[in-house]
From Swiss-Prot:
ATP binds at G37, E38, S39, G40, S41, G42, K43, S44. This is Ergothioneine transport ATP-binding protein EgtV. The lineage of its organism: Bacteria, Pseudomonadati, Campylobacterota, Epsilonproteobacteria, Campylobacterales. It catalyses: ergothioneine(out) + ATP + H2O = ergothioneine(in) + ADP + phosphate + H(+). Signal peptide: none annotated. One of its GO terms (cellular component) is plasma membrane. PANTHER family: SPERMIDINE/PUTRESCINE IMPORT ATP-BINDING PROTEIN POTA, SPERMIDINE_PUTRESCINE IMPORT ATP-BINDING PROTEIN POTA. Belongs to the ABC transporter superfamily. It is a peripheral membrane protein. Residues 5-212 form the ABC transporter domain. The complex is composed of two ATP-binding proteins (EgtV) and two transmembrane proteins (EgtU). Its EC number is 7.6.2.9. Keywords: Amino-acid transport, ATP-binding, Cell inner membrane, Cell membrane, Membrane, Nucleotide-binding, Translocase, Transport.
Length: 213
């Protein structure tokens, strides 16, 4: 299988504390990897390294066999869903959802149609489309963020505790939708979670990270 993410001999320190040392990881096309571990073990740091937001002190991180730094083309192939409300405060819900499609030059009407269809699947009423992030509940904002992260059909999707702000009903609906997207596409998923039951439901592979001593 084609390797989508390759991490080789990576070391990374944060505030003089070793988070990773000689860390290796290979993620293949179509994998759904759930990363488990206690708070502070380095789960979100791993996503930061893969996204190119953090640079290892040693070793290499490659996405699609290339380094991500300043590679706009590669970035279009990645979707990222952050923990909590990470929406652009100056854009309304619909504008947030269509942001990545706009960057790709997709027709505005087509982009909005796609966003509204996904919003309906996620239980977001059309009356919310004109609301700004500070007017949305935590669960509504999280669902808008999930749509923004998947709407452009990225080949690699990274999720950091994506269901944390949701009630049990919406959590199950969105888990089912994410599972459906994974099953019906060739996309590769990497999801950080502390919930082992959630990992068992979604993952094809799991990785437990422990804090270095």
């Amino acid at each position: 299988m084609k390797e989508i993410v390759t991490i080789e001999n990576v070391s990374f320190n944060y505030r003089n504390r070793a988070v990773f040392k000689d860390f290796n990881l290979s993620i293949e096309k179509g994998d759904f990897l759930c990363v488990l571990g206690e708070s502070g073990s380095g789960k979100s740091t791993l996503l930061g390294l893969i996204l190119g937001l953090l640079k290892p002190s040693l070793g290499s991180v490659k996405i699609f066999n290339e380094t991500l730094s300043n590679n706009a083309f590669l970035r279009q192939k990645i979707g990222y869903i952050a923990q909590g409300n990470s929406l652009f405060s100056h854009l309304n819900a619909l504008q947030n959802m269509t942001f990545c499609l706009n960057l790709q030059g997709i027709n505005k009407q087509a982009a909005q149609k796609e966003a509204k269809a996904l919003a309906l699947k996620m239980g977001l009423d059309e009356s919310l489309m004109d609301k700004f992030p500070n007017e949305l509940s935590g669960g509504q904002a999280q669902r808008v963020g999930i749509i923004r992260g998947i709407i452009h059909k990225p080949e690699l999707i990274l999720l950091d505790e994506p269901f944390s702000a949701l009630d049990s009903f919406n959590r199950k609906n969105l888990q089912d939708l994410i599972k459906e997207i994974h099953q019906n596409s060739c996309a590769t998923f990497i999801m950080v979670t502390h919930d082992e039951e959630e990992a068992q439901k979604l993952a094809t592979k799991t990785l437990e990270i422990k804090a270095l001593k």
